[in-house]
């Protein structure tokens, strides 16, 4: 649970580390590098390289956001990929080229995302780690099939968002 009006994010930038943020509750406005802004509501997911959010600011219009944040080093995963994902034909270089470009991809709430993330919140605490490992694999399979251009939320330039905030 992130509880604040705004936070700044500073970390190492890498075009091969996939950053994922699932917003379960609340709202997030995220100003990223290159002047791109993403807005997430309950059930939305953003996927981008850590280079996009290395120096960024997250705003919480409702004063909070609850969700799950994941960082996946794709070359490390590729070298240590679970056999079941290899057998499924999971193509990590394609995931990297699709989601680790210069701009983030925001996917709106949908039954598939709800099905992936909901069990993480309802599982008994002693099973959460196992569920998390399974659900990350399921999320990677989902991302390998999703076509961002058909599902993506609208992105805004940070100048547009500043103008909206002034109004």
Whereabouts are the PLM-identified features?
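Short, solvent-exposed positions on alpha-helices
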Residues: 126-134
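Charged, low-complexity, helix-prone segments enriched in Lys/Glu/Asp/Gln
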Residues: 6, 56, 98, 160-161
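Short, flexible segments with low predicted structural confidence
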Residues: 41, 48-49, 103-104, 111, ...
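Generic alpha-helical structural element
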Residues: 66-70, 102-105, 121, 128-129, ...
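Alpha-solenoid helical-repeat scaffolds
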Residues: 80-116, 149
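N-terminal regulatory/effector-sensing and dimerization cores
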Residues: 1-91
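A short, Lys/Arg-enriched amphipathic alpha-helix from helix-turn-helix/homeodomain DNA-binding modules
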Residues: 106-121, 133-167
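Secondary-structure boundary elements
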Residues: 77-80, 125-126, 140-142
């Amino acid at each position: 649970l992130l509880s604040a009006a705004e936070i700044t994010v500073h970390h190492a930038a890498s075009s091969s580390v996939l950053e994922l943020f699932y917003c379960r509750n609340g709202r997030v406005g995220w100003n990223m590098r290159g002047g791109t802004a993403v807005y997430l509501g309950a059930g939305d997911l953003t996927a981008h390289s850590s280079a996009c959010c290395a120096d960024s600011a997250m705003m919480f219009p409702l004063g909070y956001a609850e969700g799950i944040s994941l960082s996946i080093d794709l070359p490390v995963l590729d070298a240590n990929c679970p056999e079941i994902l290899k057998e499924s034909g999971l193509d990590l270089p394609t995931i990297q080229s699709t989601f680790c470009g210069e701009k983030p991809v925001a996917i709106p709430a949908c039954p598939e995302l709800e099905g992936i993330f909901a069990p993480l919140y309802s599982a008994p605490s002693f099973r959460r780690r196992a569920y998390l490992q399974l659900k990350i694999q399921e999320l990677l399979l989902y991302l390998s099939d999703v076509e961002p251009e058909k599902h993506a939320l609208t992105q805004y330039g940070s100048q547009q968002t500043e103008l909206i905030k002034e109004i």
